[in-house]
Every structure is written in structure tokens, then in C-alpha cells.
Amino acid sequence: MNPFILSILLLSLGLGTTLTFASSHWLLAWMGLEISTLAIIPLMSQHHHPRAVEATTKYFITQAAAAALILFASTTNAWITGQWDINFDLHFFPASMLTMALALKMGLAPVHFWLPEVLQGLDLTTGLILSTWQKLAPFILMCQIMPVNSSLITFLGVTSTLVGGWGGLNQTQLRKILAYSSIAHLGWMILVMQFNQQLALLALIIYIPMTFSTFMIFKTNSSTTVNTLAASWAKTPALTAITPMILLSLGGLPPLSGFMPKWMILQELTKQDIPLTASIAALSALLSLYFYLRVSYAMTLTISPNNLNATTPWRLQTTASTLPLAISATISAMLLPLAPATLALLSL
């Protein structure tokens, strides 16, 4: 893609999300969401592959339906209450519609079916943008309409953690595994959002570098399926040694960074006297941990078949900067000692 066009699209992507962040009016927030959607569509279809075009079409139809529902719900709320302000108390019916529309935009279960299929048709870089940046604006909007319908939010959170764990079990495609991982992590954030929004934001902040690291590692290895990871030792031995730590951090295993938000969320849910919800979320994390372990095993403990006379793949020096990956990998693995300081900051 032309660098000038690419810079305009990325700028529009940032502008749309920033507009939604800064808006206190539902029409402006809707406009920001639409700018982001329209900016990412050319990035998704830039390779002109039938799968990419199919994924782009599915994404466009889903996002258009969600945007129409947001517009309808906000108009209905303005008609009932006479207010367009986001921070104004919403009527229960429009609030429920808005929650479902934002859940559809983010890919929360049970309206998640588009996300694995769309991610499967994209390259890893665009998939990374879809899994991280595109979640921010709907997430912030959901934070602002939170106090209205807690039972619907709890249902979305529990369903997402279960579906995110269950759906990834039988997958061999790495992009689908990462899609279900995204659904499960968003489920954890949504569960705690109604009780402690700072904790939900902390989970999102830690989720982003972990996902960034995982996507970048798979891109460096040119891997799209679990089976192709077997050649990782020959291509990038140092990166392959670090990868299990990042994957197990995504699974929430101590003493890695990913354990911190899960630990704090379970603590908060128990404080709020909903131990059953906390238990279901904790057990669903075991399902996710299994498929992260499977990917780690395929990458580090298996070697691709070759005879002794054959040469190993060339370890070509990458031309891209490895600094962002190094920083995100460090954050993904080593933030747990900061948990007491984080708890103190959250309780201010």
C-alpha cells in the first residue's frame, strides 16, 4: 500500500478512537466509531485475497449492524429522557440495546461469531490492530453506561470467559486461537467493570502488550498454524525461548504479568459476594491455559522433521526494529512484582 494512503488510514484510525474518547454526546461517539471502522476496512482488504475480502465484508456488515443499533438506541434514549449526554442516566431499554451493540462491536459472546472468522482472513498486523486498538472505543463507552444493567453485563462476561476458553480448544489456526483468547480476556474485563472500572482498565492495559508480543512473534516466524511453529527453533531460537513465558502469561499463570489482573479480578468478585461467578471465571481460565500450553509445546518441544544432511533454515537478520517486541515481551512477563503498588494506586 502507498505509504501516504497508509498514513492517512492510520491517522483516521487514531482520530476515530480519540473522538469517541473525548465525546460526551452520543452522536459524536457514534461518529468516532464509524471513522475507525471505515479506516480499518481498506487495511483489511489490501491484499486482494478472496479470504481477506470475505473477512472485510463480514466485518463491515457486523459493524454496520452494531452502529445502526447504537444510533437507534441513543435516539430512543433521547426521545424518552430528552438527553443526548453519554454520562446522563440512561433508560433501561436503550441501555440494554447499547450494551448489546457495543458487545457486538467488541466481539463478546454470545455475539462473537464474526470475530474468529474475520481474524482468520486477515494478516497478523491488521489482526493485531483489530484485537487491540479497535476494542478501545467500545470498551470506554461500555464503562460509561455500566451502572444500568448489571445482570446483562454479568451474563456477557461469564459467557465470554467460557466461550473464549471452550472455543480455542480444538483450533489449529493461530489467528482463531488468538481470537478466542481475545474473547476470554474481554469477558474478564467486562465481569469486573461494573464493580471496579480501574481494575478493568488495568486488565486491558496488560492485555494489549501480551497480545502485541504474541502477534509479533508469530509474524516474525511467519506462522499461521500450530504445525508450522515446529520450525521456530531453527529460525529464531532466542525468541522461541521467550514465547512460552508470554503465552503462559496470557493464560494467567503466576509469577507472570497476566496473573496480576486475574488475581485482582477474582479478589474483587469475591469481595462483591459473587463467589459462583468468580469460580466459573477461574475454571474457564483453565480451558484457555490448556490451548496456550498446546501452542507452547508445539513451538518449544517439537522439532520439524528433517534429515541430518539437510541444512537448517537460515537465520536471517530482520530489518524491522525489535525494540517494540522486546519492551512488550518484558511487560508481558515481569510486571507481577508491581502488584502491591498497583493495588495501592487503584485504591486511591
UniProtKB/Swiss-Prot annotation:
Keyword set includes Transmembrane helix: yes
Record key words, sorted: Electron transport, Membrane, Mitochondrion, Mitochondrion inner membrane, NAD, Respiratory chain, Translocase, Transmembrane, Transmembrane helix, Transport, Ubiquinone
Compartments, record wording: Mitochondrion inner membrane
Keyword Mitochondrion: yes
Main localization of the protein described in the UniProt heading: mitochondrion
Record family assignment: Belongs to the complex I subunit 2 family.
Protein's recorded name: NADH-ubiquinone oxidoreductase chain 2
